[in-house]
Amino acid sequence: MDNLSERFNVLQENLMDIYESGQEDIETQIKHWQLLRQEQVLFYYARKNGVMRVGYQPVPPLATSEAKAKDAIGMVLLLQSLQKSPYGKEPWTLTQTSLETVRSPPANCFKKGPQNIEVMFDNDPENLMSYTVWSFIYYQNLDDTWNKVEGRVDYHGAYYMEGSLKVYYIQFEVDAARFGKTGRWEVHVNEDTIFAPVTSSSPAAGEGTDASPINAASRSSPARGLSATSVSTRTTQRTSPRRYRRKASSPTATTTRHKRQDIRRSRSTSRGRQAISRGGERRQRRRERSYSRDSSRSPNRGRGGSSGGPTTRSQSRSLSRSRSRSRSRSRGSSAGGGVAPEQVGKSVRSVGRNPGGRLTRLLEEARDPPVILLRGEANKLKCFRYRAKKRYGSLVKYYSTTWSWVGANTNDRIGRSRMLLAFNTYDERELFIQKMKLPPGVDWSLGHLDDL
């Protein structure tokens, strides 16, 4: 059991090194899939011998481990074949070599340059579908030779050229029969309408569904192919994707056009301004009510008022502060003369209830605990926390979970994820800064808190 845990920890360390390095070469991607295969083999062996947990990781069923191990073997073979081709020297990322990307249409091909297009059925802006097309597609022919072609879009769907044949991996006619009524549709790439809505003239049922002759597009009047790369270079001024929102896939549920969204946004902003103005009036009324209540109650509660008039909470606080200052002057020698500037932030322990008095407590609490705020992607921060706990030992007192800011009026996350690291002393924080090695794309800033 201990031997299995040690092997599993070594595999996890190697995987973390790959994720943090961010290398974009095919050798690293092959190593990544080989490690994933070894991980599933270890799980399979553990489950077969009755071990239900390796370290903190539950062991999946035998069928799950077997299926994932076979997927990893298949990916290793594909990548090793691609490595021997001229395209093996191109940069390859974890996303481009993931199982999900390889299995997405067109299946068993590598792709680069994803781009979203929209198809409107029945000329109805509410009946809109979104599809993912690719700028470049890498496929194997019958001789197991890799070829790189450009992805294209026409009225019938998204395709690429395999020799003299069009290989369609998305056909709009299929979804037109499901979601449309008239058999008409428009194709929109970015902000451009490529084709006017005409009756579909897709290949006949007797022809192949995956590939149609290259002159099949001549059967419709607006039939003209459009390269995915040319579209992306021609119209790049599109609204940036919203963070933490659901991204469009191929296909998603129906969406609305941008013009309707702009109208709704303008209406919502006008309503929001009205709501803000109403909210300001309500807050003003609450302040007036709270002031009247404080004025009516303060003669009974105020202790130090010389004239007996209304005393607010802020006035009572100022009076208590003046009393504490007068007491501290009378016993200044016992308080130790205050906290030196270099001592502020030197303690992280919360001051307990002691007979030293309020001034002693305030002086002790002036030493605030130091922290470091990290900003970056959630997965990178979690990986860094996992490694830092083993690498830096007791230098860090506490690690927070990942969190994000949200807006005052919405629940949408703002910016990147955050993580806090708390330390016992400033010296330990400085030592940690000298030793720490952050993943790419993660930055940091210093701070301190009143209490942890």
UniProtKB/Swiss-Prot annotation:
Residues 1-201 are annotated as: Transactivation domain. Belongs to the papillomaviridae E2 protein family. It comes from Human papillomavirus 17. This is Regulatory protein E2. Residues 198-356 are annotated as: Disordered. The gene is E2. Keywords: Activator, DNA replication, DNA-binding, Early protein, Host nucleus, Phosphoprotein, Repressor, Transcription, Transcription regulation. Residues 227-239, 309-319 have a biased composition (Low complexity). It is found in: Host nucleus. Pfam families: PPV_E2_C (PF00511), PPV_E2_N (PF00508). Residues 256-270, 320-330 have a biased composition (Basic residues). GO terms for biological process: DNA replication; DNA-templated transcription; regulation of DNA replication; viral DNA genome replication. InterPro entries: E2/EBNA1_C_sf (IPR035975), Nucleotide-bd_a/b_plait_sf (IPR012677), Papillomavirus_E2_C (IPR000427), PPV_E2_N (IPR001866), Reg_prot_E2 (IPR033668), Regulatory_protein_E2_N (IPR036050), Regulatory_protein_E2_N_1 (IPR042503), Regulatory_protein_E2_N_2 (IPR042504).
